[in-house]
């Protein structure tokens, strides 16, 4: 399966305005869209949103998103989830027509997509940078009580 890179993270937050003050004001993510209860942000190097904040009763990670190389990779991931007995569903979101959401065996909420709406290039708008001026989201840090087992699973199943 052709996973290209980390694509996005969606966080449930208890206070959207306080979270925006942190991610946008302090860290320097760029706000691209805000609607009732949701905000979409990105780093200055990115051409699509990479951080979605959603107002919720409790703070949590809703999904860890990965971009795949081809449409066929989404089909292969659906087959993988089905063969493993993992719950999955298809959804759409702003700028992304099809997102495959999968709950992995270790409890992580994963998401996979191929196409995303391209946003305007803003990398050289240095006057707009805030804080450290985040360029991109490029990795996730995950904690697991079974690190070896989780690592082996991902290497064997998802490459």
Which role fits each region the language model picked out?
Residues 1-17, 61-66, 117-148:
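N-terminal beta-strand motif that seeds the catalytic metal site of vicinal oxygen chelate
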Residues 1-48, 91, 101, 142-159:
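Core segments of cupin and vicinal oxygen chelate
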Residues 30-62, 109-116:
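Conserved short beta-strand elements that form part of the metal-binding/catalytic scaffold
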Residues 51-60, 64-69, 74-78, 89-92, ...:
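DNA polymerase sliding clamps and clamp-related checkpoint/processivity subunits
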Residues 71-75, 93-96, 131-134, 141-148, ...:
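Short, amphipathic alpha-helical segments
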Residues 78-136:
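Vicinal oxygen chelate
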């Amino acid at each position: 399966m052709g996973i290209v890179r980390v694509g996005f993270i969606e966080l449930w937050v208890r206070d959207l305005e306080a979270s925006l003050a942190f991610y946008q004001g302090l860290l320097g993510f760029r706000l691209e869209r805000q609607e009732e209860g949701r905000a979409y942000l990105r780093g200055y190097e990115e051409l699509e949103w990479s951080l979605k904040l959603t107002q919720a009763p409790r703070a949590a990670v809703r999904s860890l998103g990965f971009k795949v190389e081809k449409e066929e990779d989404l089909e292969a991931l659906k087959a993988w989830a089905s063969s493993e007995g993992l719950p999955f569903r298809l959804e759409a979101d702003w700028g992304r027509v099809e997102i495959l959401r999968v709950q992995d065996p270790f409890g992580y909420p994963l998401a996979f997509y191929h196409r995303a709406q391209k946003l305007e290039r803003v990398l050289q708008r240095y006057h707009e940078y805030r804080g450290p001026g985040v360029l991109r989201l490029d990795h996730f840090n995950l904690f697991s009580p079974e690190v070896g087992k989780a690592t082996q699973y991902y290497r064997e199943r998802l490459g």
